[in-house]
Swiss-Prot record:
Belongs to the uroporphyrinogen decarboxylase family. Substrate binds at residues 23-27, 72, 147, 202, 315. Its EC number is 4.1.1.37. One of its GO terms (molecular function) is uroporphyrinogen decarboxylase activity. The record marks 72 as: Transition state stabilizer. The keyword Mitochondrion does not apply. It catalyses: uroporphyrinogen III + 4 H(+) = coproporphyrinogen III + 4 CO2. It is an enzyme of class 4 (lyase). Homodimer. Keywords: Cytoplasm, Decarboxylase, Lyase, Porphyrin biosynthesis. It comes from Geotalea daltonii (strain DSM 22248 / JCM 15807 / FRC-32) (Geobacter daltonii). One of its GO terms (biological process) is protoporphyrinogen IX biosynthetic process from glutamate. It is found in: Cytoplasm. This is Uroporphyrinogen decarboxylase.
Amino acid sequence: MNTRFLDACWGKPVDRTPVWLMRQAGRYLPDYMRVRSKCTFLELCKTPELAAEVTIQPVDILGVDAAILFSDILTPVEPMGMALDFVPGPVFEHPIRTMADVEKLRIPQMEQDVPYVLETIKILRRELANKVPLIGFGGAPFTLACYMVEGKGSKDWATIKRMMYAAPEVYAALMEKVTMMDMEYLNAQIKAGAQAIQIFDTWGGVLSPSDYEKFVLPYTTKLINGLNRQNVPVIHFVKGAGTMLDTVKKAGGDVMGLDWHTNLGKARDILGSMAVQGNLDPTVLFAPNDVIEKEVKRVLDENGGRSGHIFNLGHGILPTVPPENAIHMVECVHRLSQQ
């Protein structure tokens, strides 16, 4: 098996920089759209054979060094008692607003409530056995709570911020419950065979550094400390956290995911020996081949040859990117970083 990705997570030297892409199983791939055209998004997530098929597609098409489970961060929230739909984008019919709402939430029994996720992982471990490692993932407690309180996506997340300030006891009770659920969910993925875990805190960066430290850090730290992570590296990705990496680092984890607003070299200086993942601007993949190569080289140069770097985009690949551009990017990473 290609172990470059896992080796880099642990800061070990590798013969070339490993690379994978957030949302690498997605709408930019015609093969994905062929599968997706036959079912809804939720049906795809809940059908292990299909979820496994689309997980493997980018490994074969792009030549990436890791696969990431095809699912959605809100998958384990639905069995807490929150009806979820995608219309498009996630929408919860009854958002959490009061302590009574929080008290109604249940902690799912993962093997009974999300068996399709665990079965997908088991299928993938068999099918990827001689290829690449499998990354499991979940949303960070704060990002999950954002959707649960707002009921859908938001530009400013004012509803959950108002709860933080005006009803801190409700916010704390919700975050405790979501953190416990998250811990159970990610540990179930590890038990099923996930070889690494990525925690996505997509909205952590909407807070000030002091609010992040007060309202988010304790829960993410508790989550990471509660994972059964012997030989399973944890990647912590907080979008928009470039100005507070020293604070985010306190949560623990083995790899810091970086978005494209952060200079990778400066981030490494702040993070010390901690491995990093990132951080090409996703829109670079619309550029001509020579520009893609130049930008890949820039990111590699910012790393300065230090071990413990996994190449990735600074956020998910965009749906209208030409697949051949993503293939070219992966090839450039491998060729330019070859030792």
